[in-house]
Amino acid sequence: MKRTYQPSKLRRARKHGFRNRMSTKNGRRVLAARRRKGRKVLAA
């Protein structure tokens, strides 16, 4: 059986990357929350 996680850097960046987060209001909310929490990494 094929495993469900088949990593792809491009797909990861497009779905969860910084520029994608910045492109929507809710995405910016995610980044703000992660900054508030003090996350070292904000986006993929």
UniProtKB/Swiss-Prot annotation:
Q: In its UniProt entry, what is this protein called?
A: Large ribosomal subunit protein bL34
Q: Which gene encodes it?
A: rpmH
- Start and end residues of each stretch annotated as Disordered: 1-44
Give the matching Pfam families: Ribosomal_L34
List keywords of the entry alphabetically: Ribonucleoprotein, Ribosomal protein
Composition bias, kind Basic residues: at what positions? 1-19, 26-44
Which InterPro entries does the protein's record reference? Answer: Ribosomal_bL34, Ribosomal_bL34_CS
Look up and give the organism this protein is from: Streptococcus pneumoniae serotype 4 (strain ATCC BAA-334 / TIGR4)
A GO molecular function annotation here is: structural constituent of ribosome
GO biological process annotations for this chain's record? Answer: translation
Entry's family note: Belongs to the bacterial ribosomal protein bL34 family.
GO CC terms in record? ribonucleoprotein complex; ribosome
